[in-house]
């Protein structure tokens, strides 16, 4: 791991974290805060973008280390958030909203798998 790669990860991470904050705030404002729609939205978006980045960076550009560090590890790593998803699912289930918590878990896993698959398929089709 070189210093330039760490800089790429840090830069991408900073942009991803700010993007996540803004998207979650906007979605929560629009959809309401009773259900974690904001986290679901960034995880779906991030999964789709990770699929597109995988095809472009890894398959087409043969794994350009700088772009992989900047986009896939830094930006998309900070944009998506498994730890927040886990806490929100736990919180829903602890507050007697077991069905909502389970629905959130199922939606997150299934829809994010679909999103990454769609990103890969769409990018392969375009490129």
From Swiss-Prot:
It is found in: Cell inner membrane. Pfam families: CRCB. The keyword ATP-binding does not apply. It is a multi-pass membrane protein. It comes from the Bacteria. GO terms for cellular component: plasma membrane. Na(+) binds at residues 77, 80. GO terms for biological process: cellular detoxification of fluoride. Coiled coil: none annotated. Na(+) is not transported, but it plays an essential structural role and its presence is essential for fluoride channel function. It catalyses: fluoride(in) = fluoride(out). Its main location: membrane. The chain crosses the membrane at residues 7-27, 38-58, 70-90, 102-122. GO terms for molecular function: fluoride channel activity; metal ion binding. Keywords: Cell inner membrane, Cell membrane, Ion channel, Ion transport, Membrane, Metal-binding, Sodium, Transmembrane, Transmembrane helix, Transport. Fluoride-specific ion channel. Important for reducing fluoride concentration in the cell, thus reducing its toxicity. Belongs to the fluoride channel Fluc/FEX (TC 1.A.43) family. NCBIfam families: crcB (TIGR00494). PANTHER family: FLUORIDE EXPORT PROTEIN 1-RELATED. HAMAP family: FluC (MF_00454). This is Fluoride-specific ion channel FluC. It comes from Hahella chejuensis (strain KCTC 2396). The gene is fluC.
């Amino acid at each position: 791991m070189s210093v330039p790669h760490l800089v790429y990860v840090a830069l991408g991470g900073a942009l991803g974290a700010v993007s996540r904050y803004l998207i979650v705030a906007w979605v929560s404002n629009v959809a309401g805060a009773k259900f974690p729609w904001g986290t679901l939205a960034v995880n779906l978006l991030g999964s789709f973008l990770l699929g597109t980045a995988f095809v472009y960076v890894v398959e087409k550009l043969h794994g350009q280390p700088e772009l992989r560090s900047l986009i896939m590890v830094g930006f998309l790593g900070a944009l998506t958030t498994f730890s927040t998803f886990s806490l929100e699912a736990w919180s829903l289930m602890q507050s007697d909203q077991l069905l909502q918590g389970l629905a959130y878990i199922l939606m997150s896993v299934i829809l994010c798998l679909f999103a990454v698959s769609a990103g890969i398929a769409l990018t392969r089709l375009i490129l």
